[in-house]
Amino acid sequence: MTFRMPPEWAPHERTWMAWPGPNATFTDAEELAGARAAWASVARAVRRFEPVTMVHGPGQAATARELLGPDVDLVERELDDAWMRDIGPTFVTDGRGGLAAVDWVFNGWGAQDWARWEHDAEIARHVADLAAAPVLSSPLVNEGGAIHVDGEGTVLLTDTVQLGSGRNPGWSREEVEAEIHAKLGTTTAIWLPHGLAGDYGRYGTQGHVDIVAAFARPGTVVVHSQRDPRHPDHERSQLYLEILRGRTDARGRRLEVVEVPAPTVLKDEEGEWADYSYINHYVCNGGVVLCAFGDPNDELAAGIFRRLFPERTVTLVDARTIFAGGGGIHCITQQQPRT
Protein backbone atom coordinates (compact mmCIF):
# COMPACT_ATOMS: atom_id res chain seq x y z
CA MET A 1 0.00 0.00 0.00
CA THR A 2 1.38 3.41 -1.01
CA PHE A 3 0.92 6.41 1.26
CA ARG A 4 1.60 10.07 0.59
CA MET A 5 1.64 13.18 2.73
CA PRO A 6 -1.08 15.56 1.52
CA PRO A 7 -0.16 19.22 1.24
CA GLU A 8 -1.13 21.40 4.16
CA TRP A 9 -3.84 23.14 2.12
CA ALA A 10 -5.70 19.85 1.57
CA PRO A 11 -8.81 19.38 3.76
CA HIS A 12 -8.17 18.62 7.43
CA GLU A 13 -10.04 16.44 9.88
CA ARG A 14 -8.55 18.41 12.78
CA THR A 15 -5.48 20.13 14.18
CA TRP A 16 -3.39 18.68 17.01
CA MET A 17 -1.50 20.84 19.51
CA ALA A 18 0.38 20.34 22.80
CA TRP A 19 -0.16 22.49 25.90
CA PRO A 20 2.92 24.17 27.44
CA GLY A 21 3.95 22.87 30.83
CA PRO A 22 6.88 23.64 33.13
CA ASN A 23 10.04 22.63 31.26
CA ALA A 24 13.46 23.82 30.09
CA THR A 25 11.88 26.16 27.54
CA PHE A 26 9.49 27.93 29.92
CA THR A 27 11.54 28.17 33.07
CA ASP A 28 9.44 30.40 35.32
CA ALA A 29 5.81 31.16 36.01
CA GLU A 30 5.77 34.34 33.94
CA GLU A 31 7.25 32.66 30.86
CA LEU A 32 4.87 29.72 31.20
CA ALA A 33 1.83 31.97 31.56
CA GLY A 34 2.88 33.91 28.47
CA ALA A 35 3.40 30.74 26.48
CA ARG A 36 0.02 29.35 27.47
CA ALA A 37 -1.70 32.57 26.44
CA ALA A 38 0.09 32.50 23.08
CA TRP A 39 -0.71 28.83 22.41
CA ALA A 40 -4.33 29.48 23.36
CA SER A 41 -4.55 32.39 20.92
CA VAL A 42 -3.37 30.14 18.10
CA ALA A 43 -5.72 27.33 19.10
CA ARG A 44 -8.72 29.67 19.18
CA ALA A 45 -7.75 31.13 15.79
CA VAL A 46 -7.52 27.67 14.23
CA ARG A 47 -10.74 26.52 15.94
CA ARG A 48 -12.68 29.09 13.89
CA PHE A 49 -11.99 26.86 10.90
CA GLU A 50 -11.67 23.27 12.14
CA PRO A 51 -11.65 21.09 15.27
CA VAL A 52 -8.62 21.34 17.55
CA THR A 53 -7.38 18.75 20.04
CA MET A 54 -4.94 19.94 22.70
CA VAL A 55 -2.78 17.33 24.42
CA HIS A 56 -1.95 18.45 27.98
CA GLY A 57 0.05 17.08 30.86
CA PRO A 58 -1.40 15.63 34.07
CA GLY A 59 -3.14 18.18 36.25
CA GLN A 60 -3.24 20.87 33.56
CA ALA A 61 -6.77 20.41 32.22
CA ALA A 62 -8.36 23.19 34.27
CA THR A 63 -5.83 25.83 33.23
CA ALA A 64 -6.04 24.71 29.62
CA ARG A 65 -9.83 24.82 29.63
CA GLU A 66 -9.85 28.28 31.19
CA LEU A 67 -7.67 29.75 28.44
CA LEU A 68 -8.90 27.67 25.51
CA GLY A 69 -12.62 27.93 26.12
CA PRO A 70 -15.18 25.16 25.63
CA ASP A 71 -14.63 24.39 21.94
CA VAL A 72 -11.14 22.85 22.02
CA ASP A 73 -10.94 19.13 22.82
CA LEU A 74 -8.56 18.14 25.62
CA VAL A 75 -6.58 14.91 25.97
CA GLU A 76 -4.20 14.07 28.83
CA ARG A 77 -0.77 12.57 28.10
CA GLU A 78 2.67 13.07 29.62
CA LEU A 79 4.66 15.74 27.75
CA ASP A 80 8.17 17.15 27.88
CA ASP A 81 7.61 20.19 25.66
CA ALA A 82 4.89 21.71 23.47
CA TRP A 83 5.97 21.62 19.81
CA MET A 84 3.39 19.31 18.25
CA ARG A 85 4.72 19.81 14.72
CA ASP A 86 7.91 18.07 15.79
CA ILE A 87 6.79 15.52 18.36
CA GLY A 88 3.51 14.53 16.73
CA PRO A 89 3.08 12.12 13.83
CA THR A 90 3.27 13.06 10.18
CA PHE A 91 -0.08 11.91 8.81
CA VAL A 92 -0.23 10.28 5.39
CA THR A 93 -3.10 8.92 3.28
CA ASP A 94 -3.48 6.18 0.69
CA GLY A 95 -5.94 7.99 -1.60
CA ARG A 96 -8.67 5.43 -0.85
CA GLY A 97 -9.81 6.71 2.52
CA GLY A 98 -6.98 5.18 4.52
CA LEU A 99 -5.00 7.15 7.09
CA ALA A 100 -1.62 6.29 8.63
CA ALA A 101 0.84 8.09 10.89
CA VAL A 102 4.59 8.25 10.35
CA ASP A 103 6.47 7.99 13.64
CA TRP A 104 9.91 9.48 13.11
CA VAL A 105 12.57 9.05 15.77
CA PHE A 106 12.51 12.15 17.99
CA ASN A 107 15.65 12.95 20.00
CA GLY A 108 15.24 16.52 21.18
CA TRP A 109 16.29 18.29 17.98
CA GLY A 110 19.62 16.52 17.75
CA ALA A 111 20.05 15.51 21.42
CA GLN A 112 20.55 19.07 22.64
CA ASP A 113 21.84 19.31 26.20
CA TRP A 114 18.80 21.16 27.55
CA ALA A 115 16.17 18.96 25.89
CA ARG A 116 14.18 16.14 27.48
CA TRP A 117 12.22 13.80 25.25
CA GLU A 118 11.30 10.68 27.23
CA HIS A 119 7.59 11.47 26.90
CA ASP A 120 7.66 13.49 23.68
CA ALA A 121 9.22 10.55 21.85
CA GLU A 122 5.97 8.64 22.50
CA ILE A 123 3.50 11.37 21.55
CA ALA A 124 3.36 10.46 17.86
CA ARG A 125 2.10 7.00 18.77
CA HIS A 126 -0.39 8.37 21.30
CA VAL A 127 -1.82 10.79 18.73
CA ALA A 128 -1.91 8.08 16.07
CA ASP A 129 -3.87 5.85 18.45
CA LEU A 130 -6.33 8.65 19.22
CA ALA A 131 -6.76 9.25 15.48
CA ALA A 132 -7.21 5.49 14.86
CA ALA A 133 -4.29 5.61 12.42
CA PRO A 134 -1.87 2.69 12.03
CA VAL A 135 1.73 3.66 12.73
CA LEU A 136 4.47 3.60 10.09
CA SER A 137 7.72 3.53 12.08
CA SER A 138 10.80 5.18 10.63
CA PRO A 139 14.43 4.79 11.77
CA LEU A 140 15.15 8.37 10.64
CA VAL A 141 15.56 11.11 13.24
CA ASN A 142 13.31 13.81 11.85
CA GLU A 143 10.69 16.36 12.84
CA GLY A 144 7.60 17.74 11.15
CA GLY A 145 9.11 21.22 10.97
CA ALA A 146 12.00 19.84 8.93
CA ILE A 147 9.86 18.86 5.93
CA HIS A 148 7.42 20.65 3.64
CA VAL A 149 5.61 19.00 0.73
CA ASP A 150 3.68 20.18 -2.31
CA GLY A 151 1.43 17.10 -2.47
CA GLU A 152 2.70 16.30 -5.96
CA GLY A 153 5.97 14.59 -5.16
CA THR A 154 8.28 17.36 -3.95
CA VAL A 155 9.70 17.84 -0.45
CA LEU A 156 11.86 20.64 1.00
CA LEU A 157 14.70 19.65 3.37
CA THR A 158 17.82 21.19 4.96
CA ASP A 159 21.32 19.74 5.21
CA THR A 160 21.84 20.68 8.85
CA VAL A 161 18.76 18.79 10.05
CA GLN A 162 18.44 15.43 8.30
CA LEU A 163 22.20 15.19 7.66
CA GLY A 164 23.24 16.67 11.01
CA SER A 165 25.55 14.61 13.23
CA GLY A 166 23.19 14.99 16.19
CA ARG A 167 20.36 13.35 14.31
CA ASN A 168 21.45 10.88 11.67
CA PRO A 169 25.21 10.23 11.83
CA GLY A 170 26.32 7.82 9.16
CA TRP A 171 23.34 8.40 6.88
CA SER A 172 24.11 9.54 3.35
CA ARG A 173 22.01 12.06 1.49
CA GLU A 174 20.77 9.26 -0.76
CA GLU A 175 19.72 7.14 2.22
CA VAL A 176 17.86 10.04 3.82
CA GLU A 177 16.04 10.80 0.58
CA ALA A 178 15.08 7.15 0.11
CA GLU A 179 13.53 6.99 3.59
CA ILE A 180 11.75 10.33 3.23
CA HIS A 181 10.34 9.35 -0.15
CA ALA A 182 9.25 5.94 1.14
CA LYS A 183 7.30 7.45 4.02
CA LEU A 184 5.91 10.60 2.36
CA GLY A 185 5.29 9.32 -1.16
CA THR A 186 7.60 11.98 -2.60
CA THR A 187 10.08 11.53 -5.43
CA THR A 188 12.06 14.80 -5.53
CA ALA A 189 13.92 16.44 -2.64
CA ILE A 190 15.03 20.06 -2.79
CA TRP A 191 17.77 20.70 -0.25
CA LEU A 192 18.67 24.01 1.33
CA PRO A 193 22.04 24.16 3.11
CA HIS A 194 20.82 25.53 6.44
CA GLY A 195 18.11 27.44 8.27
CA LEU A 196 18.00 31.00 9.57
CA ALA A 197 20.86 32.19 11.78
CA GLY A 198 18.74 32.47 14.92
CA ASP A 199 17.70 28.83 14.63
CA TYR A 200 21.18 27.80 15.76
CA GLY A 201 20.84 29.42 19.18
CA ARG A 202 20.30 27.55 22.43
CA TYR A 203 16.66 26.66 21.82
CA GLY A 204 16.88 26.46 18.04
CA THR A 205 16.12 23.45 15.88
CA GLN A 206 19.42 23.67 13.97
CA GLY A 207 17.80 24.55 10.69
CA HIS A 208 14.13 23.67 10.22
CA VAL A 209 12.90 24.46 6.74
CA ASP A 210 9.43 25.62 7.83
CA ILE A 211 10.79 29.00 8.93
CA VAL A 212 12.68 29.44 5.64
CA ALA A 213 10.51 28.22 2.76
CA ALA A 214 7.13 26.56 2.24
CA PHE A 215 4.94 25.53 -0.65
CA ALA A 216 1.84 27.69 -1.11
CA ARG A 217 0.57 25.54 -3.98
CA PRO A 218 2.19 23.10 -6.40
CA GLY A 219 4.97 24.91 -8.23
CA THR A 220 4.93 27.95 -5.92
CA VAL A 221 7.10 28.44 -2.85
CA VAL A 222 7.14 31.32 -0.35
CA VAL A 223 10.60 32.26 0.91
CA HIS A 224 11.84 34.34 3.82
CA SER A 225 13.51 37.47 2.47
CA GLN A 226 15.66 39.51 4.84
CA ARG A 227 16.20 42.81 3.04
CA ASP A 228 18.49 44.47 5.60
CA PRO A 229 22.18 43.71 4.90
CA ARG A 230 23.02 44.24 8.58
CA HIS A 231 21.18 41.05 9.51
CA PRO A 232 23.00 37.71 9.09
CA ASP A 233 19.91 36.29 7.38
CA HIS A 234 20.30 38.75 4.50
CA GLU A 235 23.03 36.66 2.90
CA ARG A 236 21.23 33.44 3.80
CA SER A 237 17.94 34.47 2.24
CA GLN A 238 19.71 35.56 -0.95
CA LEU A 239 21.17 32.07 -1.16
CA TYR A 240 17.76 30.43 -0.61
CA LEU A 241 16.25 32.54 -3.38
CA GLU A 242 19.05 31.66 -5.77
CA ILE A 243 18.78 27.94 -5.07
CA LEU A 244 15.00 27.75 -5.32
CA ARG A 245 14.78 29.84 -8.47
CA GLY A 246 17.09 27.35 -10.12
CA ARG A 247 15.19 24.23 -9.14
CA THR A 248 12.35 22.26 -10.67
CA ASP A 249 9.78 20.19 -8.81
CA ALA A 250 8.75 16.56 -9.23
CA ARG A 251 6.54 17.48 -12.19
CA GLY A 252 9.39 19.29 -13.93
CA ARG A 253 8.06 22.80 -13.26
CA ARG A 254 10.52 25.58 -12.53
CA LEU A 255 9.52 26.95 -9.14
CA GLU A 256 7.71 30.24 -8.86
CA VAL A 257 9.42 31.93 -5.91
CA VAL A 258 7.44 34.46 -3.86
CA GLU A 259 9.57 36.60 -1.57
CA VAL A 260 8.00 37.42 1.80
CA PRO A 261 9.90 40.31 3.41
CA ALA A 262 11.07 39.68 6.96
CA PRO A 263 9.77 41.92 9.74
CA THR A 264 11.69 45.18 10.00
CA VAL A 265 12.82 44.47 13.57
CA LEU A 266 16.36 43.13 13.59
CA LYS A 267 16.83 42.01 17.20
CA ASP A 268 14.54 40.35 19.70
CA GLU A 269 13.84 41.36 23.29
CA GLU A 270 17.01 39.60 24.42
CA GLY A 271 19.14 41.61 22.01
CA GLU A 272 19.80 38.61 19.75
CA TRP A 273 19.34 38.62 15.99
CA ALA A 274 15.65 37.93 15.48
CA ASP A 275 14.60 35.03 13.28
CA TYR A 276 11.02 36.30 13.10
CA SER A 277 9.49 34.88 9.93
CA TYR A 278 6.08 34.95 8.28
CA ILE A 279 6.90 31.69 6.51
CA ASN A 280 6.09 29.78 9.70
CA HIS A 281 2.34 30.03 9.09
CA TYR A 282 -0.42 27.41 9.29
CA VAL A 283 -2.96 26.65 6.57
CA CYS A 284 -6.24 25.20 7.86
CA ASN A 285 -9.73 24.65 6.47
CA GLY A 286 -10.74 28.00 5.05
CA GLY A 287 -8.03 29.91 6.87
CA VAL A 288 -4.38 30.87 7.13
CA VAL A 289 -3.07 31.63 10.62
CA LEU A 290 -0.12 33.96 10.16
CA CYS A 291 2.55 35.07 12.62
CA ALA A 292 2.43 38.73 13.64
CA PHE A 293 5.20 40.65 15.38
CA GLY A 294 3.75 44.10 16.01
CA ASP A 295 5.70 45.14 12.93
CA PRO A 296 4.90 47.37 9.92
CA ASN A 297 5.49 44.37 7.65
CA ASP A 298 2.74 42.32 9.33
CA GLU A 299 0.08 43.69 6.99
CA LEU A 300 2.40 43.47 3.99
CA ALA A 301 2.85 39.76 4.67
CA ALA A 302 -0.88 39.31 5.23
CA GLY A 303 -1.52 40.86 1.83
CA ILE A 304 0.87 38.43 0.16
CA PHE A 305 -0.86 35.46 1.77
CA ARG A 306 -4.30 36.81 0.88
CA ARG A 307 -3.24 36.90 -2.76
CA LEU A 308 -1.84 33.38 -2.55
CA PHE A 309 -4.90 32.01 -0.72
CA PRO A 310 -7.81 34.15 -1.98
CA GLU A 311 -10.40 31.61 -0.84
CA ARG A 312 -9.15 31.62 2.77
CA THR A 313 -9.35 34.08 5.65
CA VAL A 314 -5.93 35.27 6.82
CA THR A 315 -5.74 35.76 10.60
CA LEU A 316 -2.77 37.45 12.27
CA VAL A 317 -1.76 36.17 15.72
CA ASP A 318 1.09 37.68 17.74
CA ALA A 319 3.86 35.08 17.71
CA ARG A 320 6.69 36.85 19.54
CA THR A 321 6.26 34.77 22.67
CA ILE A 322 6.25 31.57 20.62
CA PHE A 323 9.43 32.61 18.81
CA ALA A 324 11.07 33.39 22.15
CA GLY A 325 10.64 29.70 22.94
CA GLY A 326 12.23 28.57 19.69
CA GLY A 327 9.46 28.30 17.10
CA GLY A 328 6.38 29.77 15.51
CA ILE A 329 2.75 29.01 14.71
CA HIS A 330 3.58 26.19 12.30
CA CYS A 331 5.79 24.60 14.96
CA ILE A 332 2.94 24.21 17.47
CA THR A 333 0.31 22.82 15.09
CA GLN A 334 -0.01 19.50 13.27
CA GLN A 335 -2.70 18.71 10.74
CA GLN A 336 -4.63 15.46 10.46
CA PRO A 337 -5.87 15.17 6.87
CA ARG A 338 -9.47 14.40 6.11
CA THR A 339 -9.97 11.00 4.49
Curated annotation (Swiss-Prot):
Keywords tagged on the record: Hydrolase
Catalytic activity: agmatine + H2O = N-carbamoylputrescine + NH4(+)
Active site: C331 (amidino-cysteine intermediate)
Example of a GO biological process term: putrescine biosynthetic process
GO molecular function ontology, one term from the record: protein-arginine deiminase activity
EC numbers on record: 3.5.3.12
Class in the EC hierarchy, top level: hydrolase
Family recorded in the similarity comment: Belongs to the agmatine deiminase family.
HAMAP family per record: Agmatine_deimin (MF_01841)
Name of the protein this chain belongs to: Putative agmatine deiminase
Species annotation: Streptomyces coelicolor (strain ATCC BAA-471 / A3(2) / M145)
